[in-house]
From Swiss-Prot:
Belongs to the EF-Ts family. This is Elongation factor Ts. It comes from Nautilia profundicola (strain ATCC BAA-1463 / DSM 18972 / AmH). GO terms for cellular component: cytoplasm. Residues 82-85 are annotated as: Involved in Mg(2+) ion dislocation from EF-Tu.
Amino acid sequence: MANITAAMVKALREKTGAGMMDCKKALVEAEGNEEKAVEILRKKGLAKAAKKADRNAAEGRVEIYISDDYKKGSIAEVNCETDFVAKTDEFIEFVSETVKTINVNDIADTEALNKAPFGAGTFEEELKVKIAKIGENIVVRRIGTIKAPENGIVNGYIHAGGKVGVLVAAACDSEKTCEAIKDTLRDIAMHIAAMKPQYLNPEAVPADVIEKEKEIAKAQLLKEGKPEQVIDKIIPGKIKRFYSDVCVTEQEYVKAEKKETVAEALSKAAKAAGGEAKLVDFIRFEVGEGLVKNACNMADEVAAALS
């Protein structure tokens, strides 16, 4: 039987984050071989992680990664169970490395991400080890990437400590214009974070959504006693106001000194550099959007853990 020293246990614990007794048992089983002990702990970690996989993960962090040339941006929402874990350096670093992996490897979905090289193995393997180490369920809920068109640029913004993340892309007439609007594009990403647009522009709004808005507007006007011939003239104005609420290009730009839309603000920034630019895409993620958070209290959690 190999002599297992305190230093060996300490080194394995620092490497894996597992408990002291778990590390000692793994080293004994591996007859002192650290790499085998790591493998043993990882296998045990997978078993521990599987038990946590059905637990509610509605907290977390959104992170973005933009390539050095501003031609490609990626975004990911990674969920955990508590806000406490979401704010730890270890979780923040894990999310940052995750979105970087997505960007560098052109990963389109979570299935491909699971198979991607990450750390000492695949992403799926490292995720399960991380779950075992942190002690909470961790889920990569959604990912996305925007690639700039030719003579285009991508920029982004993270708001409220990773609670909201935005990527936004613009097409320009030249690389010079792209460089000139870089900061404006980041400001537009800030606008998107705050104003929560649903669509890029009026052309992106589905026809059935527009028809529904027209029906709602007509019903409201009829209730007000407006005659049919007047209603037909009022509805286009109501649809225009609808666009200004839900389309980023039509929204009133929050950083404008004078009243102007987001599209106008971008165009003005491009013209100042002698060029032209327009928005072509955006992604906005907000942590826990659409998820139901676990409302149980600490006493419930302890009781659940003991059951």
